[in-house]
Design a protein with these regions (language model features):
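Ubiquitin-like/PB1-type beta-grasp interaction modules and other compact soluble beta-rich domains
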Residues: 1-64
Length: 65
């Protein structure tokens, strides 16, 4: 299916947020996620379905000062 990740087009086989994160290389990284502008908590990612055309945002925390 075709989705966008951080504004870039991606073709993925996975159908949940958690599986997509693994497929695109985030694995178990500590990140925040939003699907179509709505926050998706870490404990909801495994069940949160993603559909063709959806927009996934993945944000990693910054460190330093």
């Amino acid at each position: 299916m075709k989705i966008s990740v951080n504004g870039q087009p991606h073709e993925v086989k996975a159908t949940t947020v958690a599986a997509i994160l693994t497929e695109i290389g985030y694995g178990d990284a500590t990140v925040a996620t939003a699907l179509n502008g709505d926050f998706v908590a870490a404990d909801r990612r495994v069940n949160q379905a993603v559909r063709d055309g959806d927009a996934l945002e993945v944000l990693a925390p910054r460190q330093g000062g």
